Amino acid sequence: MSKGAVGLTAGYWPEDIYRYLAIPGISLDDGLITRPGRRRADHPAVISYQGIFTYRQLAAEMDQTMKAILSFTEGKSARLAIAIQQPLDLVKVIFGAVKGRCSLFLMNPSLPAHELTQQLDQFSPDLVITDDAHFKQEADSLPQRARVIQFQELEGKGTGIPVPRGRQDLQAPAIALALGDGGLVYHSHKSLLAGAVSWSTFVPLKAEDLVLGLQPLYTWEGLYSLFPVLFRGGTCLLASLEDPDRLARAVRNHRPCYSLLPRPEAAKLYRPVYSSVVQAFRQCLQGLFVSVVGPFTAAGRRRLRNLLQKPALLTYGSAESGAVLSSHPTWYLDAAVGIPLTNVDVWPLDPSNGNPLEVPWETIEYAEIGVKSPMTAADYQTPEKREKYIRGGWSRTWIVATMDPNGLFYLQSRIPD
């Protein structure tokens, strides 16, 4: 299928993969838990070292957690800062909070105190929920008025709390993520569901698939490991690289098809301590997606492919835009990062100021990548931040790239911020 036939500028598009796909007008909890659960109630939704939730169980835990959270907020929607390390508990809180129509900020529990202070000041939560005693101690000592509770305090709470009713604004800020420059970016139900639809369409993922999530859920890579496979009614194995032998056993037991790792994390696989993980990946994975934030070498990519004996599939994305460009399992070159994801349009911007150029990629040597898609952030911390990131309706990336006649993009350099 030619790219021209599906709305791109030139070149090739993978067969049987939609270029554009409508995003359902439903909430995140409905699209990822409730609706898949009607079809596959007893199918595993999330697996961790601590246990398994089927879709039926996760739906029940979501409802119970929602009511428990609302019992601490007088039954009203609130702003929640979440710093939970245990994966299954974190999943319960995320979906319980969004179903309760709360806005939440997914935090890194291991943040230094000064960063913790800065981020909590920016988000101004009504309630902080954590399972980390040190984090609670740090948060309690901060000069802010939010109540800090341990996750365990949610147990048994919420009896008699009514479920929120009425029309929900699916484009309002729902989940905040931290940006690299210290600010926050806000995603809506719509933008996060769009990411789930688009990534699961592009890869593609099916209801029979199991995806390995190795990144924390406060990162975009973590969310894109979990949400897309849930949208398809599949399973996510939530693990980490911290215990290589335990991870290797889990991979062999559950046999995931894909995983997504940032480049620095993927580089750890060369260390001798991860030899058992490498062997398990060789036996089970169909490919490893590696997210990059700038230029890379084709030789480095080939080295990783040779290590794993499986495709090293590169992806460029960010907290504000989600996945933007990616290798496809059936279509990639070693020197190219890939093609635009399903539902993603990219346009050349002037690298000197970020303004959209008046000519397409085919007519220029290089330009900054501008992004427009339903996955981009719903809002930023301040109007000044929004003005910095959005130019002429296109999201800036500060990445200079070039496009070849096949529509593949090559990352050239990063513009100093």
Where on the chain are the PLM-derived regions?
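Active-site loops of AMP-binding adenylate-forming
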Residues: H189, N306, S318-A336, L349-N355, ...
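Conserved AMP-binding A3 loop
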Residues: T54-R56, R167-V197
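Gly/Ser/Thr-rich phosphate-binding loop
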Residues: C257-L260, P272-D334, D345
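Conserved AMP-binding/adenylation subdomain of ANL enzymes
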Residues: L193-L210, Y218-Y258, P272
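N-lobe entry segment of adenylate-forming
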Residues: M1-F53, Q57-F72, A78, A133, ...
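Structural core segment of the AMP-binding/adenylate-forming
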Residues: F72, K99-G158, G166, R252, ...
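Conserved ATP/PPi-binding loop(s) of AMP-dependent carboxylate-activating enzymes
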Residues: I339-N343, G354-R391, L408, R414
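Conserved AMP-binding/adenylate-forming
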Residues: G51-I52, M66-L111, G213-P216
